[in-house]
């Protein structure tokens, strides 16, 4: 009834996967399922703090829904990919012609992406790294990097390290958000990925997440 598609866990992730599958089936019988799933994903977009105000680094992203109360880059990528694919499916259906389509707040999404990209000048997230080797890359969510962190001994400031798979997720999210390729945020993540390009490991993570890294790189 609420549009989600899951078996009791990983609600947003599984809904997004299912929505993508329904979106590539050229059959109008699934239009209602697609619309309801889109609405559930749009309604799950994180808005902490004051509602309607981008006052938290997690605002604008999407999370597991059933597991954590914050957004992360993996779930966000799945959500935005599903929303764009289903948007195309609805546009190509005569049954959906001229009907309003529930959508994400794409500007809020850009706020979340800024909170996860190591470009501190673009966000007020205090955990972003100022180290040149991290510049432009992405972290898992505003408070965590799977590649770990560096703590300044004097200031005790935490800097979250960029890593490969999630930086590809960030680059793809910019594409789905239709951020221009010449935008400095896009250029920065492409530069980081180029500087850290390898097929031997998931940069910053070693062998962990290697096949996911390949999967996103191939896309």
Task: Specify the residue positions occupied by each region the protein language model found.
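An alpha-helical repeat/solenoid feature that recognizes helix-turn-helix modules
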Residues: 1-39, 43-219
